[in-house]
Amino acid sequence: MTEPKYWQQSKEFLSKADPSLEELLLKHEDYIISSRGEALETLLRAIVGQQISVQAAASVWGKLANKIGQIKPENVLSLSFDDLKACGLSKQKTQYLINICNHFISFSIKDHSHWEDRSFESVYQELITIKGVGPWTAEMFGMFYLLEQDIFPIKDIGIIRAMNQIYGDGNILSKNQIIEISEQWKPYRSVACWFLWKSIDSEDVQY
């Protein structure tokens, strides 16, 4: 797995910018956000992980990966809808996986060259044209495949929960309050989010 070049610098920046994060950074200093280096796998894992716990997602993915074998679009599409769904997916998620694989085949996406030298906004706009890939899934792709350093998935349930605990003393923060707090983390909001996830779940978030 690949470690971001900005990792150490970002932790130093965040420790100074936000004292509330400093304790988290020290507690989890040995943990690093990383990329699997596989675009398709990252997207499929993000779909599997939508709105379920890290542990539940790992269980479903294990069954799915075992059935697919090598993670290639043609291998996924060679399985029937029911075979995919039987791994623990909803009907919607099953269709979303198929949609992503069809996109990879239609655009002949075989390696990183399709994504390199592009802005995240360009990649984001492409991804959300795929039915089932919304803002959150595209943001996870940016964070965990492209290793973009300044992504803030504002609708992520885990991020909201962690911020309520740390900055709201358990009270529910408004969207504007969440945005205002996150401003101090720029240009390393992806890193701040990763440590917020660690604060509520001992399992690493990894797509």
Where are the regions that the model predicts?
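Alpha-helical ds-nucleic-acid-binding substructure associated with the helix-hairpin-helix region
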Residues: S20, L24, I52-S53, A57-T129, ...
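Alpha-helix N-cap and coil->helix boundary residues
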Residues: S35, Q55, S59, I71, ...
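Structural motif
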Residues: I33-E41, G88-K91, S182-R189
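C-terminal accessory module of base-excision DNA glycosylases/AP lyases that mediates lesion recognition
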Residues: M1-Y31, F120-E121, P135-Y207
